[in-house]
């Protein structure tokens, strides 16, 4: 969850017995574009975690298979325990751009995204968050 599951929140969750935690969801486009230093919180800083948080998943969202592939490659280099693709966020500024739950309306595009992420994840498991 954006602006919720940051490092302090994840640490508290682990201390209270959470089996697994996830990063805030990371915008693949923003990560690929590498915004200026003052905007880094929107991208690569969200990939930071401590070993004490493990197991931990990095959650990515985006509509383009190309940006998702690049973002997944970057995420995999951080060595999380898994990569999660967000196909469940219904917030309009995400879904109306074809990301999050917006991918559920385009199964062929969703498949491309998932295949590209799996292709660069290596041995890391890849999961997909959806909504029914």
Q: Model-found features: residue ranges?
A:
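Glycine-rich, positively charged N-terminal anion/phosphate-binding segment
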Residues: 3-78
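Hydrophobic "anchor" residues on beta-strands that sit immediately upstream
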Residues: 20, 82, 125
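Non-cysteine beta-strand/loop elements that form the S-adenosyl-L-methionine
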Residues: 23, 81-91
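Active-site-proximal loop/turn and secondary-structure-junction residues that shape catalytic pockets
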Residues: 27, 62, 89-91, 132
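Alpha-helix-loop-beta-strand connector modules within alpha/beta enzyme cores
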Residues: 42-57, 102-128
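Active-site glycine- and acidic-residue-rich loops that bind
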Residues: 62-68, 125-132
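A structural signal for short coil/turn segments at secondary-structure junctions
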Residues: 78-79, 121
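Surface-exposed, active-site-proximal loop segments in enzymatic domains
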Residues: 91-104
């Amino acid at each position: 969850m954006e602006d919720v599951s940051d490092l302090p929140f994840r640490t508290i969750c682990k201390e209270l017995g959470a089996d697994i935690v996830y990063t805030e969801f990371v915008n693949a486009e923003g990560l690929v574009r590498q915004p200026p230093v003052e905007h880094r919180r929107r991208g690569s800083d969200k990939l930071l975690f401590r070993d004490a948080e493990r197991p931990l998943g990095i959650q990515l969202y985006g509509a383009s298979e190309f940006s998702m592939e690049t973002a997944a490659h970057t995420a995999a280099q951080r060595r999380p325990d898994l990569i999660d693709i967000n196909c469940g966020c219904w917030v309009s500024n995400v879904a109306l751009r074809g990301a999050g739950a917006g991918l559920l309306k385009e199964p062929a595009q969703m498949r491309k995204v998932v295949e590209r992420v799996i292709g660069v994840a290596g041995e890391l498991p890849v999961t997909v968050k959806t909504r029914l």
